[in-house]
Amino acid sequence: MTQLPTNPMPATPLLDKVDYPDDLKKIDDRDLPQLAAELRAEMVDAVSRTGGHLGAGLGVVELTIAIHKIFDTPHDRLIFDVGHQCYPHKILTGRRDRIRTLRQEDGLSGFTRRAESEYDPFGAAHSSTSISAGLGMAVAAELDGKSRNVIAVIGDGAMSAGMAFEALNNAGALDARLIVILNDNDMSIAPPTGAMSAYLARLASGRTYMGIREVGKKLTAYLGKTVDRAITRAVEHARGYVTGGTLFEEMGFYHIGPIDGHSFDHLLPVLRNVRDNAKGPVLIHVVTQKGKGYPPAEAAADKYHGVNKFDVITGAQAKAKPNAPAYTSVFADALTQEASLDDKIVAITAAMPSGTGLDKFASVHPSRCFDVGIAEQHAVTFAAGLAAEGYKPFAALYSTFLQRAYDQVVHDVAIQGLPVRFPIDRAGFVGADGPTHAGSFDTTYLATLPGFVVMAAADEAELKHMVRTAAAYDEGPISFRYPRGEGVGVELPERGEILAIGKGRIVKQGNKVALLSFGTRLADCLLAAEDLDAAGLSTTVADARFAKPLDHDLIRQLARHHEVLITIEEGAVGGFASHVLQFLAEEGLIDGGLKVRPMVMPDIWMEQAKPEAMYARAGLDRAGIVSTVFKALGQKHGVGLGAAG
């Protein structure tokens, strides 16, 4: 690991006076720029020590301060979409003393969480949920007869997802008291600046123009929708500038902006006006700069979205020397290689080109790589359309995000038997991002679908084989899963082999205990086998490769010639083990006394930690496997056995 210097803590005399949002209300507006600078320094220092999402939070410092100063949180509900931008919010809401535990074991979450603070009314991590949740809270307040503001802060990327527009449409129809702040940090033009634009923003959010809109609504009741549109356009012109807000106005929102999200002269009066005057749904378009105030992040916003620990002075990130190539990199290289040999191969990502490795693919095959944005549902059906026309689409998604498109997987892909390939990254525990990003369920929900081939790579060489196997398979949908992080260091073939569908492999032969692994727990199985052999328990280790179709011959062999059969997987109950147990029961292979023990993720939400610590806590490591075997045999765990020995 690169050694970083220990930088001194930043001086923050004004921030030191702020423990909770009520303290902000005591600070003069003229001192807020200093507070913003100190808050940025505190955030940069904290993330430099823990790693995390830096750029998004730096971009909303002024906005976060302004919201908490103007509104009455937690009585007023403040919801952050995704949550990458919530670090300044956490510092201002009683969690500054723990901010240097971000994303660490037993530390603060990197996202908003209801269980963590009353200032987090709704948890987040996946995108585009804030407006729906906020609308629910706004309607609940109306039903309860309570006067309460609900503010949803959503980025321009998250706004591209269909769920956000579904919520906007419903909010406009209900005319609910909801404030949506569109944080636009990817605008191609500079935000409006200067006294005139600040004046116009105040004017547009004030009582006069909001009153014009109310008159327009009443006229519409008598004169129809056409007149309403004309009034909307007239109001836009009366504001004195073209806002681009016509779409939101058509959906029933009062639109304000764009305004400079780094100017308190813009933010404070607009938020005050909206708080005091607005009725119905309001959308405030705020333009910000990702990474604002920290030069390395401003210069390379993409590289400072999510960061490792880094040196505050230089911005240099700590990087461990790799022992083996990362699974994501192996996948990307293998797919790029296959695409060079087959011009029907295309790749699809949902706003994660770097995370899935498809940026590598795109650099070689730019016309055959499609980033569809934060739109997993569309990504899957788009892939289905390509498959229907004879192409070989690889829809590369994280396991946790594939959940968002399950109906499309079932209805548009599986029922039609279309050969869409699903490379599933971030399988199993992912570490610092915690339960919201764990790849726990894909085997369970895919292997239940008729005609679906479900694979898991045991190591990086197996991953190359599975990429080629998927490219060659045209009989229906096929998936292969692999984890975050480095491989185990096996030798990589020049090109992957085409695997026989539904066939596993024996890696080590024994005769008393059988360990049947699905996925990268294979390495721990081999280590556990060393301990078991040393204890006189001859152990077979097998790599299933496939959860569907199962290798029936392999399972019969293991069941008939061993006293104990353990299945191990990096997934929830209902996955690989359930299919194995179903087969064993149907075949009568457990009637003769075979001791079968499934090892799966525990039925809890596993909190953030390093992945190896999470697997140990789950009992899915070397020591856990050895312990499970001894318990199955009714024996005490031998002294010195397992990883903990």
Swiss-Prot record:
Its keywords, alphabetically, are: Isoprene biosynthesis, Magnesium, Metal-binding, Thiamine biosynthesis, Thiamine pyrophosphate, Transferase
Cofactor binding: number and manner = Binds 1 Mg(2+) ion per subunit.
Keyword Magnesium attributed: yes
Q: Name one GO molecular function term.
A: 1-deoxy-D-xylulose-5-phosphate synthase activity
Cofactor names: Mg(2+); thiamine diphosphate
Put simply, this protein is called: 1-deoxy-D-xylulose-5-phosphate synthase
Annotated EC: 2.2.1.7
Q: What does this protein do?
A: Catalyzes the acyloin condensation reaction between C atoms 2 and 3 of pyruvate and glyceraldehyde 3-phosphate to yield 1-deoxy-D-xylulose-5-phosphate (DXP).
Q: What is the lineage of its organism?
A: Bacteria, Pseudomonadati, Pseudomonadota, Alphaproteobacteria, Hyphomicrobiales
Its subunit composition reads: Homodimer.
**Which SUPFAM superfamilies does UniProt cross-reference here?**
Thiamin diphosphate-binding fold (THDP-binding) (SSF52518), TK C-terminal domain-like (SSF52922)
- Listed binding positions for Mg(2+) are 156, 185
Q: Which residues hold thiamine diphosphate?
A: 84, 125-127, 157-158, 185, 294, 376
Highest taxon of source: Bacteria
Catalysed reaction per UniProt? D-glyceraldehyde 3-phosphate + pyruvate + H(+) = 1-deoxy-D-xylulose 5-phosphate + CO2
List the pathway annotation: Metabolic intermediate biosynthesis; 1-deoxy-D-xylulose 5-phosphate biosynthesis; 1-deoxy-D-xylulose 5-phosphate from D-glyceraldehyde 3-phosphate and pyruvate: step 1/1
